[in-house]
Amino acid sequence: MKKFLLLSLMSLSSLPTFAANSTGTIGIVNLRRCLEESALGKKESAEFEKMKNQFSNSMGKMEEELSSIYSKLQDDDYMEGLSETAAAELRKKFEDLSAEYNTAQGQYYQILNQSNLKRMQKIMEEVKKASETVRIQEGLSVLLNEDIVLSIDSSADKTDAVIKVLDDSFQNN
């Protein structure tokens, strides 16, 4: 009975020590900041915005042409001045251009979504590598995404260190 009591007492007394040690080995990383503030994240975001703008410009030209044809189709005086064949051709052109626009828009969104997914995967791979480097350098047991932590001391935030490793890695490549 004395051995059990002694063992229980030793176990209980070691719990606060273990808890104190384990909290010092946990760090957090704000992924959003890594994406927005790292050189890699900024570069990838700029390339994505450039692609979006290119698509928007090409879609804008089609929209202008569709709008112009639509205005003509809605103008009764203009349509009355056309022959039946010319009016039919104008309607057909509008239908074809509308179908082409809808197809292009669907492809545009699909390409943008795929590109964004690849971009995020690439950045996340680099954040994981940088996080592992920081975890080892700082002697941490674990680095967690800040979004899953309800409360932790601000000294556990290792986001700046991860961003620095990301930037160093980006400059070396």
Curated annotation (Swiss-Prot):
InterPro entries, alphabetized: Chaperone_Skp (IPR005632), Skp_dom_sf (IPR024930)
Protein keywords: Signal
Biological processes, Gene Ontology terms: chaperone-mediated protein folding; protein stabilization
Gene3D superfamilies listed in its UniProt record: Skp domain
Range of residues in the leader sequence: 1-19
GO molecular function, one term: unfolded protein binding
Family: Belongs to the Skp family.
PANTHER family according to UniProt: CHAPERONE PROTEIN SKP
Protein name in the entry: Skp-like protein
